[in-house]
């Protein structure tokens, strides 16, 4: 079992039950999944960019990404329906906890001028989205082998009903919020 999962079961659940006044252990919010997405508009001209991005995403998450395709054609972007335009990975269970642990303890501190993450990026239902400007903050990525700096989106899905519950859970998990 992942270190963060054990910590959640042994320490975070009782702390959340006490803080939020939950009567049943099933009311306590928990992580459902983490979706890591890399959108690549440049993949329209050069498909090789997509292959390198998929390799990097696999190294970061430890799981093979799925190639995302365009849902509809947009003439202004020279985009046709079904063209590959990105890649995404959905992490669950132990891999999810291990990824979050590495993100909080290793990757986020490597961001230049890091002062914490915004507490306003919740969606109203307790889920949190985070944008990373460059994939180089992850220790799995070798700086010399990177041909182009790419950003990625990380969405943390929880069972929390409100943003306050979700923020309390993620704060206990170690996410460094600014406010």
Curated annotation (Swiss-Prot):
Gene Ontology MF terms: rRNA binding; structural constituent of ribosome; tRNA binding
InterPro entries associated with the record: Ribosomal_uL5, Ribosomal_uL5_bac-type, Ribosomal_uL5_C, Ribosomal_uL5_CS, Ribosomal_uL5_dom_sf, Ribosomal_uL5_N
UniProt GO BP: translation
Gene name, Swiss-Prot/TrEMBL: rplE
Known role: This is one of the proteins that bind and probably mediate the attachment of the 5S RNA into the large ribosomal subunit, where it forms part of the central protuberance. In the 70S ribosome it contacts protein S13 of the 30S subunit (bridge B1b), connecting the 2 subunits; this bridge is implicated in subunit movement. Contacts the P site tRNA; the 5S rRNA and some of its associated proteins might help stabilize positioning of ribosome-bound tRNAs.
UniProt cross-references to NCBIfam families, sorted A to Z: PRK00010.1
Provenance organism: Geobacter sp. (strain M21)
Protein's name according to its UniProt entry: Large ribosomal subunit protein uL5
Similarity-based family: Belongs to the universal ribosomal protein uL5 family.
PROSITE patterns per UniProt: RIBOSOMAL_L5
